[in-house]
From Swiss-Prot:
Similarity-based family: Belongs to the frog skin active peptide (FSAP) family. Peroniin subfamily.
Species the sequence originates in: Litoria peronii
Keyword Secreted set for record: yes
Modified-residue entries (Pyrrolidone carboxylic acid), positions: 1
List of residues that carry Arginine amide: 7
Domain of life assignment: Eukaryota
Listed GO biological process terms: defense response
Principal subcellular localization: secreted
Name of this chain's protein: Peroniin-1.5
Keywords for the protein's UniProt record, in alphabetical order: Amidation, Amphibian defense peptide, Pyrrolidone carboxylic acid, Secreted
Tissue occurrence: Expressed by the skin dorsal glands.
């Protein structure tokens, strides 16, 4: 995934 809403 290129972006996640958490790290």
């Amino acid at each position: 995934q290129p972006w996640l809403p958490f790290r």
